[in-house]
């Protein structure tokens, strides 16, 4: 649920968003050159910028690299558990369709080329899939960091034509010791919260 976006599906300019996204992804070098290579590297790739509007690398690393990679791995394991052959292909197709739909919505009100989808689709989403293909990486995030998908349960309101309660969120929890019930806690997605959590004996 994003405050800066309408939750009415009819307010999304789907054709314009897809057209802009197709132009951007079809001409990645031209898109980056229009923004400037230096600006692209410092805002999208490397953690050099600190301004809120310039630190696009933060959601790139957290949502696309780690979150997207974990979502791919979960999807792959879901397809495998349900007896699908070629579970990697199914998972990749599903997660790619999701990412393209998300980028289309983000580009629906834009008129110029934007380098953010280039970094998302061609760098961080791909790197996330490759990273979580590793069983060792997946075990680290799943067992050591106890990473979970804490996304909302979306619903469609046909009377108002709105998509309610949507949002993709993730959580990691790092245990502070084998004998302590306390863990460092970080939750991110629609917003970010850092703190501590306590394991209760009854679950």
Residue ranges and their predicted role:
Residues 1-203:
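Hydrophobic alpha-helical membrane segments
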């Amino acid at each position: 649920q994003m405050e800066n976006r309408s939750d009415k599906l009819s307010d999304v300019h789907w054709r314009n968003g897809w057209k802009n996204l197709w132009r951007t992804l079809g001409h990645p070098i031209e898109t980056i050159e229009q923004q400037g290579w230096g600006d692209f590297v410092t805002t999208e790739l490397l953690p050099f910028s600190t301004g809120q509007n310039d630190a696009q690398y933060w959601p790139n690393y957290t949502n696309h690299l780690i979150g997207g990679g974990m979502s791919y791995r979960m999807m792959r394991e879901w397809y495998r558990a349900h007896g699908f052959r070629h579970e990697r292909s199914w998972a990749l197709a599903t997660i790619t369709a999701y990412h393209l739909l998300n980028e289309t919505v983000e580009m629906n009100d834009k008129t110029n080329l934007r380098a953010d989808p280039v970094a998302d689709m061609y760098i961080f989403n791909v790197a996330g899939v490759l990273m979580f293909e590793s069983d060792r990486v997946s075990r680290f995030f799943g067992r050591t960091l106890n990473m979970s998908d804490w996304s909302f349960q979306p619903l469609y309101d046909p009377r108002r034509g709105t998509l309610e309660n949507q949002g993709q969120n993730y959580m990691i929890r790092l245990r502070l010791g084998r004998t302590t019930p306390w863990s460092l806690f970080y939750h991110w997605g629609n917003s970010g919260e850092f703190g501590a959590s306590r394991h209760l004996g009854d679950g």
